Design a protein with these regions (language model features):
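Extended ligand-binding clefts on enzyme/binding-domain cores
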Residues: 1-41, 45-131, 139
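CBM-like carbohydrate-recognition segments
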Residues: 93-103, 119-129, 135-226
Length: 226
């Protein structure tokens, strides 16, 4: 409900709020994509607890319409890979639109046999973005590409099973490959690897979290006016 209090009139959720509660002036595509997924998950959990929250699903529907029909509603962040694949990974874009979205950004963000660049103007490949992009392709039905992307994260794997956050592959062959941030292996990177492997393999009941629509038991209930 705190998140929904940060909606603009068009239904987009602003990115942040100052300590004095002054809202920022813009919404992010990546953030709103994550929020629409969280709202649907929250509504499904609320159903299980016997406390239906149909207004959460209604708010997610509004976000879906914005994401699929009016990308101009969001602050431009085309440099970042997350803005490319998050609408697909989180289920806002599906079907032909999802496939087209992923195809459109592939050449801008993907280094073949390396992975997904965090930003499109640097040679910095991150295991988390590569894994999340694999989930997005899995959600769009391109499981073979998803597997390939996940395999590309193997150079990030340490002997202890953790994963280096990022690797910079220099454009000039004579330059040295470096890890960036230096020698960082992060929990969020490991989490992204686990989620991608599960989505691709179907290894747990949670494997469809990003690849199938979130089903509500009380979907027939009407939301209050927003």
């Amino acid at each position: 409900n705190w998140v929904l209090d940060m909606r603009r009139e068009d239904g987009a959720v602003i990115w942040a709020r100052e300590v004095d509660s002054q809202p920022w002036g813009y919404a992010l595509l990546t953030g709103c994509s994550s929020i629409r997924h969280a709202l649907r998950c929250g509504a499904a959990l609320a159903d299980l607890l016997g406390d239906p929250q149909p207004e959460w699903t209604s708010a997610a529907d509004v976000l879906d319409r914005l994401i699929t029909t009016n990308l101009e509603a969001f602050e431009p962040k085309e440099r970042w890979a997350m803005d490319w694949y998050y609408p697909v990974m989180t289920g806002a874009m599906t079907g032909a639109q999802a496939k087209a979205r992923l195809a459109e950004g592939w050449d801008r963000f993907v280094l073949d046999d390396r992975g997904v660049r965090c930003v499109n103007d640097e040679q910095w490949v991150t295991a988390a973005e590569t894994s999340e992009c694999a989930i997005a392709h899995c959600a769009a039905g391109d499981r073979d590409i998803a597997r390939e992307l996940l395999l590309w994260t193997m150079p990030h794997r340490r002997e202890d099973g953790a994963y280096w956050t990022g690797i910079v592959y220099p454009a000039e062959p004579e330059k040295t490959i470096v890890r960036f941030p230096a020698d960082e292996y992060s929990a969020y990177t490991a989490a992204a690897i686990i989620l991608a492997a599960d989505a691709i393999s179907g290894g747990s009941p949670a494997s469809t979290l990003f690849t199938q629509p979130i089903v509500r038991k009380n979907a027939h209930l009407k939301a209050r006016a927003l």
